[in-house]
Amino acid sequence: MSDPSSINGGIVVAMTGKDCVAIACDLRLGSQSLGVSNKFEKIFHYGHVFLGITGLATDVTTLNEMFRYKTNLYKLKEERAIEPETFTQLVSSSLYERRFGPYFVGPVVAGINSKSGKPFIAGFDLIGCIDEAKDFIVSGTASDQLFGMCESLYEPNLEPEDLFETISQALLNAADRDALSGWGAVVYIIKKDEVVKRYLKMRQD
């Protein structure tokens, strides 16, 4: 039996810049080596917080719906949008609740704190252990390749356009070296007052 989190393939990467943060994913949905769709986005947003989820596609969809419900409930109770740091704790506790029958996912959180304006990124394992970073977080079937590309290309305090170029090159080159991811990509550049979404074309083989 293969690892359930690699059956459908897919990758997510997040990077911090100067007063900005970027998160990107590929668009492939597969069933091992069989391609199913090239329009499967793995990044979701709840207010100004972004969540990328790799892993088993059914769990990705389930978690998106669950976090949509929980963040809407939070907004009703607290009368404010959830901050990235708070959302990270919510993701962690939600995954840990299911530790004996876990969701087979690798979530990545990215966002800008609305008060301090500081960029924030964090990753998790499938039972909710938090991995905060100041530079980049990777997840998915090409995570080894992404680590190599990010360590080669990343520089601290990049401007938004330079950050877009860096995260795009890292994702495109990593996906080219992994049979289970690719088929296009989507990149979000998040600043305090705006979000830019761009699609990248990739090889379709």
UniProtKB/Swiss-Prot annotation:
Keyword set, alphabetical order = Cytoplasm, Isopeptide bond, Nucleus, Phosphoprotein, Proteasome, Ubl conjugation
**The keyword Ubl conjugation is annotated on this UniProt entry:** yes
Q: Name one GO cellular component term.
A: proteasome core complex, beta-subunit complex
State its location(s).
Cytoplasm; Nucleus
User: Cross-referenced SUPFAM superfamilies, in alphabetical order?
Assistant: N-terminal nucleophile aminohydrolases (Ntn hydrolases) (SSF56235)
Residues recorded with modification Phosphoserine: 31
Q: Give the sites of the cross-link named Glycyl lysine isopeptide (Lys-Gly) (interchain with G-Cter in ubiquitin).
A: 70
Listed under subunit, the entry gives:
The 26S proteasome consists of a 20S proteasome core and two 19S regulatory subunits. The 20S proteasome core is composed of 28 subunits that are arranged in four stacked rings, resulting in a barrel-shaped structure. The two end rings are each formed by seven alpha subunits, and the two central rings are each formed by seven beta subunits. The catalytic chamber with the active sites is on the inside of the barrel.
Q: What does this protein do?
A: Non-catalytic component of the proteasome which degrades poly-ubiquitinated proteins in the cytoplasm and in the nucleus. It is essential for the regulated turnover of proteins and for the removal of misfolded proteins. The proteasome is a multicatalytic proteinase complex that is characterized by its ability to cleave peptides with Arg, Phe, Tyr, Leu, and Glu adjacent to the leaving group at neutral or slightly basic pH. It has an ATP-dependent proteolytic activity. This subunit may participate in the trypsin-like activity of the enzyme complex.
Name of this chain's protein: Proteasome subunit beta type-3
Gene designation:
PUP3
